[in-house]
Amino acid sequence: MGIFSGGKKYDPDELMKGKLSAASDGLKRPCVSILWAGRLIGWKHPDASIRLAESLKEKGYSFKMTLIGTGEMEEQLHNMIRDKSLEDCVEMPGAMKASEVRSYMEKADIYLFTSDFNEGWGAVLNESMNSGCAVVASHAIGSVPFLIKDEENGLIYENGNQKQLEQQVCRLMDDAEYRMKLGLNAYHTIADLWNADVAAERLIDLCENIIFAKKTKSPYENGICSEAKVMENDWFGK
C-alpha cells in the first residue's frame, strides 16, 4: 500500500509544545482545541462534530472546535450551532488555503475525521497525523486501517456510532498526557514511515525484487508498498 501526502519535518518537541493550550475558561482548566476540515457534505458527516460539541458542552468540558470548509451543508451546520447555543465554543471560518489549514492542525490537540466508506483514502489523515494531532477517526475511511493503530497513534470508532465517537474524544479530553502521546506517535508514523524518501526507496526495492528476483509478493509487512489486502467492512473490532 502506498499513499503519502503533506509530509513535513518538525522538531517533535517544539511541535507538541505548541499544542499546550494556553487558553483557560476562567476555571483554570485547559481549553482543548478540536479541529475538523473538509468539504461540508453528507458523506463526510461534519454534523457529527456539532453533536459532539453539544455533548462536550453539556458535560462541562472546556474546548474550542473549528470546522474548516464550505459545502452544501454549511447553512444547516450554522443553524445547528445557533439552535444548540454553541456559538461560544464552535466556529466555522469557511474555506482556507492548504497552508492555513496546516497552521490550524499544528495548533490543534484533537483532529476529527468523520467520513464514511465514500472516503477512498483521505489525505487529511496523513496531514493531521503529521501535524501531531491526536486523531479520532471513523473505521470506514480508506486510510485508517493502514495509518492508525488503535490506541497507539490514534483512536478509531465504528462508522456512524455517535456514542463511540463521543467516548473516544472524552478519553482524550480527560487525559492530556495520553492525548500528547498519541499525537507524538502519529507524527512519527508519517515523518518516519509514510514519506517520499521511504516511498522512493521501497518502490525501487520492490521493482528490483519483481524484475531480478522474480518475487511478486511485497517484502513489507506495513507502510508504503506493503500489500493492500481486501478487508471486510466490519474489520474494526474483530
Show where each model-derived region lies:
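A structural motif in glycosyltransferase catalytic domains
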Residues: 34, 48-50, 65, 165, ...
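Acidic donor-binding loop of glycosyltransferase active sites
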Residues: 106-120, 133
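Conserved donor-binding/catalytic core segment of Leloir-type glycosyltransferases
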Residues: 23-44, 50-53
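Short hydrophobic beta-strand element within catalytic cores of glycosyltransferases
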Residues: 134-138, 148
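Short alpha-helical donor nucleotide-sugar binding micro-motif in glycosyltransferases
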Residues: 95-96, 103-108
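Nucleotide-activated donor-binding/catalytic signature segment of Leloir-type glycosyltransferases, i.e.
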Residues: 78-96
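A short, well-ordered alpha-helix in the C-terminal region of glycosyltransferases
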Residues: 164, 171, 178-192, 199-205, ...
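Conserved acidic donor-binding segment of nucleotide-sugar-dependent glycosyltransferases
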Residues: 150-151, 155-162, 171-176
